[in-house]
Amino acid sequence: MGDKPTLVTLLTVAVSSPPPSSPLPLVSFTELLLPPPSVAAAAVAATATSEVGEKTAEQEVAAAGPETRNERRENREDEGGETRTTGTTAVKRSHDGIPRQLAERLRLCRHMDPEQDYRLPAQDVVTSWIEALRDADRDNYGRCVRHAKIHRSASHLTAYESYLVSITEQYNTASNVTEKASYVQGCIFLSFPVIYNNTQGCGYKYDWSNVVTPKAAYAELFFLLCSTSESSVVLQPLITKGGLCSSMAVYDEETMRQSQAVQIGFLHTQLVMVPFVPHACPHYAVPFTTPGKPGCGGAPSGVAGLEETAPFGRVSVTRHGATLLCRVDHLTWISKRVTTYGHKKITRYLAQFRGTMDDDEAALPGEDEAWIASKNVQYEFMGLIFTVNVDSLCVDAEQRQLLGTVATSFCHRVSDKITARNMPRAFSFYLLTSAQRGYDLRFSRNPSLFFSGDALNCPLLNEPNVFSLTVHAPYDIHFGVQPRQTVELDLRYVQITDRCFLVANLPHEDAFYTGLSVWRGGEPLKVTLWTRTRSIVIPQGTPIATLYQITEGDGNVYSYNHHTVFRQMHAAGATTFFLGDMQLPADNFLTSPHP
């Protein structure tokens, strides 16, 4: 326990910077690279033995003591389980006892600091900075105001109208454009040819098509690209910035009958580009759950993935004001698997823990509190990156215990070469706690394990993109059986305002199509995918969908066929726009100027 951290500790455990209110002793990166005395002694003994030439490698290891044998065994595991001895010749080591191959690697990155990705400014500096901004706000009275995400409830077409006219004219002047686009009542209408390929002699209903459209450059301005009801070929809806777009095309029955004899031909689809400005993603938090009570959004009570028969790790919790610093030891990891294409694949690793506050007088988090965790911590094994973070937490007030789980995220692929023995034995994270009422959006689990995007890390980023989140594949998705797959993630949310998430395609994705749908609070997230060919495999960790915040409306996109078109309805002197059975909220889809 008195030795300095070993090299294995450096490579396998990410060090999280403690809060400034409780500073820990700093250890330089050079000190961390120095071997403990036991390893140094073993290295000297090995050098002397090689000069005399009397001891074999096995005798050297036996004489080194159990501590050194364990460290060498860990080094062998860290190198992917390769044998470190051949016959009677030990693996060559550098002068400081580190394997030569590993020493060369460390020499190349010796100037790097693994803590740079986790370093934050001191809390008193941040507090002073915020107070200075408030003082500046008073001086700026009557001028501009600092932006708040929630204050704007709707966008206005008049802010973009001249720009939309400009990009329409720019599109029409291109030499390769044969069908001119027109800007009418806030939308861009255009016609585009679709190649119909029936060389195999049997008509089919689904196809794939690429189209080129006007392109927007504003960060918050997108388009809903879809077909109108006059189209014989219906392009399935996309959320796009414009430019080159790929989507699934659907032919109606009449078009299929008329095109049976045609081998290769052209059909035209009538397209509309509806300006779309999503809401900025609000600040989020995850409520603390309590035993026996339903979680956020109707999620099951307790901790997600908790297994009473599995061993618990031990967590010690230190309170620093509104921040909880958690140190977890003795973790036992459980692999979660799914059967895909006839093979069981690892989807993630999960470990559970429980423990108490270090200070018996410190208060436990209450039911009305919520938390935001520190960022995902990166680990590496055999050159493969994966990330780990806290998943869910439960407070047992009667036992004064904190129960929870840590898990690998879906944002990276978990290789089959990684086993539970390679997972970190200890972990650390911090929680920023505050009252639930201060957050409009509350998830049932840590969204950082499921999504990526600037909106999850706004306080740490300069000019973040707060208009979208990216969903990643939770496992390898095979399309060998059928071209349509639905992926379900056990994640729910509750939102106080009348907003929800729009599940949409990835920009410029042409290998598969993501069906447009609405994800409402209290429901698990479902993503429906189509592929062009059945030989495509989407690896775990691949982005598969994009989430946008919109004002909640009626209906949803329930089917993806020739009825999924843009249409309008007139009633009581008002016009309402629909995409299939989904009503388009006027706050986000700008089809006409707001009064």
Curated annotation (Swiss-Prot):
Residues 68-82 have a biased composition (Basic and acidic residues). Pfam families: DUF570 (PF04489). InterPro entries: Herpes_U10. Residues 47-94 are annotated as: Disordered. The keyword Chloroplast does not apply. Keywords: Host cytoplasm, Host nucleus, Host-virus interaction, Inhibition of host innate immune response by virus, Signal, Viral immunoevasion. Residues 1-40 form the signal peptide. It is found in: Host cytoplasm; Host nucleus. One of its GO terms (biological process) is symbiont-mediated suppression of host innate immune response. One of its GO terms (cellular component) is host cell cytoplasm. Belongs to the herpesviridae U10 family. Interacts with host CGAS. Plays a role in the inhibition of host innate immune system by targeting host CGAS and promoting dissociation of DNA from CGAS, thereby inhibiting the enzymatic activity of CGAS. This is Protein UL31. It comes from Human cytomegalovirus (strain Merlin). The gene is UL31.
